[in-house]
């Protein structure tokens, strides 16, 4: 039996909802049990756990009505949806550290992305256990596929990174380097992440299946929208061009060159004069980091919003 892309898409919602809601698994992961020796019944069939993470995706309250996302709809229809959920941190690595440890950034110490800014640190595997370590402790095989961005793995300069995340509790990762979400990486590399995940699941099917597995799949998109040069001038007007990543116009292929009719938000014309000062400061800093973008340029802002919709659609098909 081979797992295809269609099989993965069909099974996402069911696999995620049944695995994550298993009472026996939830009981095993209680804080009081984490430091105890594993006493699971090896003869009992335990659920495999599939975690799927997308990068820089926001709540879907403001998407255009004609944008259909069938894979995400299957999740909504077959799982628990947290409509009032708020993330613990906006930045990539701090937010990801919360997801994979269950601890706030005050505990993970990741206040910035590893390698960027004074005082930026890596996630410490012995101080803040990850889901990989917790599931290993109760007898699971573990694998992580895709964007990591929680430690400076690339600094190790290894030709094969397949075992580079073992200190964090994941038996297997990927041969190539970590990807920090650079320009076009979602469009160009998410399909490779999926293929790597399919290969892992196919290999598990070839074994006797007595040991359950935890597989975390971490896609880039809709992160590609971060590096869109929406007016053709942003890349050249950045304070430090090329910092972290280059910026580039939309890819000239569907869905990235398509207009989804994504309208401007009702707050578009707000001059921020009645808002907290931090909002204006954030806008000012964005002009330096992402280059000059006129806040009143409706066409450029529509390009950003429609490119985000395109990233979502491409991600949904992946």
Regions found by a protein language model. Give the residues of each.
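Formylglycine-dependent sulfatase
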Residues: 3, 7-16, 23, 29-318
């Amino acid at each position: 039996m081979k797992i295809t892309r269609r099989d993965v898409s069909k099974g996402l919602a069911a696999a995620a909802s049944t695995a994550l809601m298993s009472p026996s698994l939830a009981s095993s992961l209680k804080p009081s049990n984490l430091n105890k020796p594993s006493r699971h019944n090896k003869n009992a069939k335990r659920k495999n756990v599939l975690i799927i993470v997308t990068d820089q995706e926001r709540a879907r309250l403001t998407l255009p009505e004609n944008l259909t996302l069938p894979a995400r709809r299957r999740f909504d229809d077959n799982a628990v949806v947290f409509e009032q959920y708020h993330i613990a941190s906006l930045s990539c690595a701090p937010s990801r550290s919360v997801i994979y440890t269950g601890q706030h950034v005050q505990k993970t110490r990741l206040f910035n992305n590893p390698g960027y800014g004074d005082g930026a640190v890596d996630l410490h595997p012995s101080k803040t256990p990850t889901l990989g370590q917790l599931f290993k402790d109760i007898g699971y095989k573990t694998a992580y596929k895709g964007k990591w961005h929680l430690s400076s793995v690339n600094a190790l300069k290894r030709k094969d990174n397949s075992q580079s995340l073992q200190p964090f509790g994941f038996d297997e990762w990927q041969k190539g380097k970590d990807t920090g979400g650079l320009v076009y990486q979602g469009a160009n590399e998410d399909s490779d992440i999926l293929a790597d995940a399919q290969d892992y699941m196919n290999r598990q099917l070839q074994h006797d299946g007595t040991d359950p597995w935890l597989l975390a799949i971490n896609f880039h998109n809709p992160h590609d929208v971060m590096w869109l040069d929406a007016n053709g001038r942003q890349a050249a007007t950045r304070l430090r061009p090329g910092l972290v990543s280059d910026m580039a116009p939309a890819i000239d292929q569907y869905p990235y060159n398509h207009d989804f009719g994504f309208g401007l938000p009702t707050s578009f014309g707000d001059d921020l004069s009645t808002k907290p000062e931090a909002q204006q400061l954030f806008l000012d800093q964005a002009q330096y980091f992402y280059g000059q973008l006129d806040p009143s340029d409706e066409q450029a802002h529509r390009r950003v919003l429609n490119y985000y919709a395109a990233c979502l659609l491409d991600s949904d098909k992946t």
